[in-house]
């Protein structure tokens, strides 16, 4: 993979990883022209996106750790931990059972379309409730489950699944739902990346990698994800997610058309 292609894929990952539009759906289209992504490459560009969100929320994370004596911080941190543990336990069960849909165009396309419809419904339902900021235990549990659903069904979008299940479960405030979804995603994605990285090294998948290309992709993904998430957090203060939902549906239909005509696997 040449350096320009690595940078382009880093841009795509950075934009799409935390926006509720599915990074998988975009990367599967891109690789038709830019070449197949190795497991190591996928891990590296995702790690860059996770690092960006960690940087954005570092003060919040430090506050949760150092301010554990505060009942509000302690309650919030406990809910983050429970959501993460639910994801981790269910993730191990799913891995053991070997249940995961293939990353091919058709299932990803349907996940995009169904997810877009789900987002429109969630916005409609949330608009009819008071914009509560509270993260309840029900929200924490459902967010933990939603992360696994997103992992099992490529194209769902982890951020989309978690944000909108939080909104439907009672956290009507978009900013609060998004913050909790992103904070839960930090340990979840670090753990998943570490697991996949160890597995890749153990299986010899790192042999022959172009480390310069990996470095470029990592840096680009980090910078672009930082900009994308900062923009998203500002956008949702006064806007709904409806445009993302419409975009998902259009992309899903496009993928179905490309699959039907043989342009994509």
Curated annotation (Swiss-Prot):
The residues that cross the membrane are 38-58, 80-100, 107-127, 135-155, 178-198, 216-236, 244-264
Q: Where in the cell is it found?
A: Cell inner membrane
Gene Ontology CC terms, in alphabetical order = plasma membrane
Q: Which domain of life is it from?
A: Bacteria
Q: Could you tell me the EC number(s) of this protein?
A: 3.6.1.27
Which HAMAP family does the record match to this protein? Undec_diphosphatase (MF_01006)
Q: Mind telling me what this protein is named?
A: Undecaprenyl-diphosphatase
The source organism is Rhizobium johnstonii (strain DSM 114642 / LMG 32736 / 3841)
Q: Which gene encodes it?
A: uppP
């Amino acid at each position: 993979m040449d350096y320009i292609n690595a940078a382009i894929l880093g841009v795509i990952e950075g934009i799409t990883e935390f926006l509720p539009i599915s990074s998988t759906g975009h990367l599967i289209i891109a690789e038709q022209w830019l070449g197949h992504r190795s497991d190591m490459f996928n891990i590296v560009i995702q790690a860059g996106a996770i690092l960006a969100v960690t940087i954005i929320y570092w003060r919040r994370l430090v506050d949760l750790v150092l301010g554990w004596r505060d009942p509000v911080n302690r309650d919030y941190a406990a809910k983050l931990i429970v959501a993460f543990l639910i994801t981790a336990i269910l993730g191990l069960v799913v891995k053991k059972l070997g249940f995961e849909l293939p990353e091919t165009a058709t299932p990803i396309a349907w996940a995009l379309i169904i997810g877009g419809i789900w987002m429109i419904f969630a916005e409609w339902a949330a608009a009819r409730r008071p914009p509560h900021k509270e993260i309840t235990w029900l929200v924490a549990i459902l967010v933990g489950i939603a992360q696994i659903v997103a992992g099992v069904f490529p194209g769902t979008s982890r951020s989309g699944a978690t944000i909108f299940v939080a909104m439907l479960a009672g956290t009507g405030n978009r900013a609060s739902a998004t913050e909790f979804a992103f904070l839960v995603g930090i340990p979840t994605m670090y753990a998943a990346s570490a697991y996949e990285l160890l597995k890749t090294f153990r299986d010899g998948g790192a042999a022959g990698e172009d480390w310069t290309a990996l470095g470029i992709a990592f840096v680009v993904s980090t910078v672009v994800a930082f900009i994308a998430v900062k923009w998203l957090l500002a956008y949702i203060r006064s806007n709904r997610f409806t445009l993302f939902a419409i975009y998902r549906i259009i992309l899903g239909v496009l993928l179905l058309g490309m699959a039907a005509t043989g342009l994509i696997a």
